Structure formats: structure tokens, C-alpha cells
Amino acid sequence: MIPLYMSERSMADITLISGSTLGGAEYVAEHLAEKLEDGGFSTETLHGPLLEDLPNDGIWLLITSTHGAGDLPDNLLPLYEELKEQQPDLANVRFGAIGIGSREYDTFCGAVEKVETELKSCGAQQIGETLKINILDHDIPEDPAELWLAEWENLLKTD
């Protein structure tokens, strides 16, 4: 049975999920959505969604920053907790992941690692390697994300 909220939403090729405190991951998500649309994909960008906001199949692209001691942004924490507690069946979800953080901390990109772990434990399959952007090396995180996206798009086409 398809939940009511699923039948009411439009289906995008790729759902971008951002977790951000200061807006950096949101900017990256919006930039990548534009690039994906230029490449012929339809997208939906959700900033800090709940589990019920997400399709239970298809392709997700997670973009999140890390704060404090490997902490998730406040707007992504509810989704992470839902994944951990509910363990939904995400066997029909494939995902890519981008983390933004500072190598000054030993928990560099800890937030993306936490969400990745939960997605995989729910059966989601990762496409490609996770991009971890060190903000000390990249003033504009959209730049390395765009380079990574080109490779990731090729993986989507061959998958």
C-alpha cells in the first residue's frame, strides 16, 4: 500500500537532502540541483526533511555540514533519529553523499558518516564515494561539489 503522502507528491529523478546550520550545505544542494537539471534530471531539494517527506525509492543526494563534535545540523537531526529508530525499508533507495566540515577537528565530516551508516543499515545502496569537503581548502564548497557531481552523474548513467 502506498502511503497517501506518496501518491500526492511529484516524483523527481533525484531528491536532494540538505542539513545545514549556516546555509553552506543548502547553497551546495541548490547549486547541484541546477547542475542536475541542466543534465536532464528532474530534482526536488528538501532542507531538513522528515522521513515522511522523502520518497521510499529512487535516488537521494545527501549534502550536510558537521558542527561541534561531529554533530548533525539541527534541521537534519530529526531525520537521522527517525532513520535510527524506525529502520524503514530503503532497499529501493540509492544515494550519494557530500559532507562539509573542517579538518581542524578529529570529527571531520562526522555528520555525513552518521547518516550514511543509518541509510545503509536501512538497506539503501550508496552510489560512488562520499565527497568530504574541507572548508579550509575550499572557500566555495560548490566548486569541489560540482566536480564530484560530474563523476557521480556518470555512475548514475552506467548503473
Residue locations for each model-derived region?
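A short, well-structured beta->alpha microelement
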Residues: 37-52
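FMN-binding flavodoxin-like domain, especially the glycine-rich phosphate-binding loop
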Residues: 7, 12-13, 18, 23-30, ...
